[in-house]
Amino acid sequence: MMLKGLTAQYLLRRTYRVKKGDWILVTAAAGGVGSILCQWAKALGAKVIGVVGSEAKVALARREGCKQVLVMGKDDLVARVKEITKGAGVPVVYDSVGKETFFAALDCLAPLGMMVTYGNASGPPPLMSPMELAKRGSLFLTRPSLFAYIAKREDLDASAKELFRAVTTRKVKLHVGQRYPLSEAAQAHRDLEARKTVGSTVLIP
């Protein structure tokens, strides 16, 4: 809970502070961090557009709080986001996929929007010139990490307190999607890399 939950906390509350009424885009919306992001963002009053890797994950993403769900490889992400937001785009994208979604995610942003790339499930994002941000509407790009946000004890305590409050008030429910015996750890890694998993993955000794 702590690693994924604290990651969601700093993304939503500090990197870009989600506001009531915001349309936001979350990739890997059925994943471990993504599912927490979607639930928590909905509780904050945001409207979540979730991106998932297959049709099989659509229903789960909706249960986790997504108002709209798009499927990679099937939906045109940019066109659908612009349609959903009536041409405005979103103020923030939370992307943990990386290479496969990077440029499409940038093109989903409203002018002055923020691209938050916090994971590389499909490989690292491509190199690009800062001018790409300028020509897309003076966008902001950040690659945050949890440990910079909790380096000070007071920051860790405050973040953990907010996370536990979200869990105990049922704004966030932790979802274990699959369990593997420790002897099948290699298979668990293969399934994670192939993006076959949903929610959190647990290894059982």
What positions do the PLM features span?
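A glycine-rich, Thr/Ser-enriched phosphate-binding loop motif common to dinucleotide/cofactor-binding enzymes
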Residues: 1-14, 27-30
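Rossmann-fold NAD(P)-dependent oxidoreductase module
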Residues: 36-40
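C-terminal hydrophobic helical "lid"/dimerization subdomain
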Residues: 153-205
